[in-house]
Amino acid sequence: MAGMQLDEIIEYLRYSKHIPEETIYELCLKCQELLVNESNVTHVDTPVTICGDIHGQLHDLLTLFEKSEGIEKNRFIFLGDFVDRGFYSLESFLLLLCYKLRYPDRITLIRGNHETRQITKVYGFYDEVIRKYGNSNVWRYCCEVFDYLSLGAIINGQIFCVHGGLSPDVMTVDEIRSIDRKQEVPHEGAMCDLLWSDPDEVDTWSLSPRGAGFLFGKNEVDQFLHRNDISLIARAHQLVMEGYKEMFDGGLVTVWSAPNYCYRCGNVAAVLRIDDDLSRNYTIFEAVPAQDNRGNAIIPTKKPQMDYFL
């Protein structure tokens, strides 16, 4: 790709080194060609590690892989929100794309509510690209990849993975497969809800305070599990100070993988490994220090923009 080999690009990204614009264009194009053949809901076998929001925290993403013994030996599902708020959204997303090309059967990338043109223009990713490249071309290339990301995954036919949650317009996983995903995320409807909805202690569907998606409760989760003959919904989308949170008698779990979110929240992060017997094993990890052993800044001192809600 523009004179750079894939493994060389990976090494550059791990150290947040500059990648030529032409190389990023070719990388994004190759990823689209790969992702277009994937279903809206990707089938994944165990063992697999489920990862929540990353939000541009590159160094913590590298820690995540280290704690999980690396992508060379394991499968991973990332539940979206790769970009915005952190300082290294571009490097984080491109690194995951490189891994997708390098190990296509070992990594599944699901779209989050931040993988849209509208959201990234407001919450950091667009401005980051302008700052690093002086124009919006790289942002546009990445946004085109967003449109090809899957909306969910099914692990061993038993665990449904999604970024946000459920939708009153979708009763079965098969209905999700019929959605036209190759578009900007709509402001309402099933595709929007899957990326924006949240679980809560409510009796029935309620409008979300986020302004998009719905709140759903135990009844909706139990019905979805029963109707689809599955045992668990794994999702991300909400900060959890302890890294993960199980709800509704273990029928739903929120996984959060961005420690010390926005470099100030003080939370730990988690990933969830699902073994062949469908047992759940959580790994908790903390954020990388702000400085290395020599006192050099790893994380810039300027804080990213804080916005609509954590």
Curated annotation (Swiss-Prot):
Keyword Metal-binding listed: yes
Active site: 114
Locations listed in the record: Cytoplasm; Nucleus
Keyword line: Cytoplasm, Hydrolase, Manganese, Metal-binding, Methylation, Nucleus, Protein phosphatase
The protein's enzyme class: hydrolase
InterPro entries named among the record's database cross-references: Calcineurin-like_PHP_ApaH, Metallo-depent_PP-like, PPA2-like, Ser/Thr-sp_prot-phosphatase
Cofactor details (free text): Binds 2 manganese ions per subunit.
GO biological process, one term: negative regulation of DNA damage checkpoint
Pfam families reported for this sequence: Metallophos
Keyword Isomerase: no
GO MF: metal ion binding; protein serine/threonine phosphatase activity
UniProt modified residues of type Leucine methyl ester: 310
Reactions it catalyzes: O-phospho-L-seryl-[protein] + H2O = L-seryl-[protein] + phosphate; O-phospho-L-threonyl-[protein] + H2O = L-threonyl-[protein] + phosphate
Domain of life, source organism: Eukaryota
Binding residues for Mn(2+) 2: 81, 113, 163, 237
Cofactor(s) listed in the protein's UniProt record: Mn(2+)
EC number: 3.1.3.16
Entry GO CC: cytoplasm; nuclear periphery; nucleus; protein phosphatase 4 complex
Residue numbers binding Mn(2+) 1: 53, 55, 81
Entries under SMART domains matching the protein: PP2Ac
Described purpose of this protein according to its UniProt entry: Involved in the dephosphorylation and activation of the transcription factor GLN3 in response to nutrient availability. Forms the histone H2A phosphatase complex in association with the regulatory subunits PSY2 and PSY4, which dephosphorylates H2AS128ph (gamma-H2A) that has been displaced from sites of DNA lesions in the double-stranded DNA break repair process. Dephosphorylation is necessary for efficient recovery from the DNA damage checkpoint.
Assembly and interaction partners: Catalytic subunit of the histone H2A phosphatase complex (HTP-C) containing PPH3, PSY2 and PSY4.
Similarity remark: Belongs to the PPP phosphatase family. PP-4 (PP-X) subfamily.
Protein name from the UniProt record: Serine/threonine-protein phosphatase 4 catalytic subunit
Protein species of origin: Eremothecium gossypii (strain ATCC 10895 / CBS 109.51 / FGSC 9923 / NRRL Y-1056)
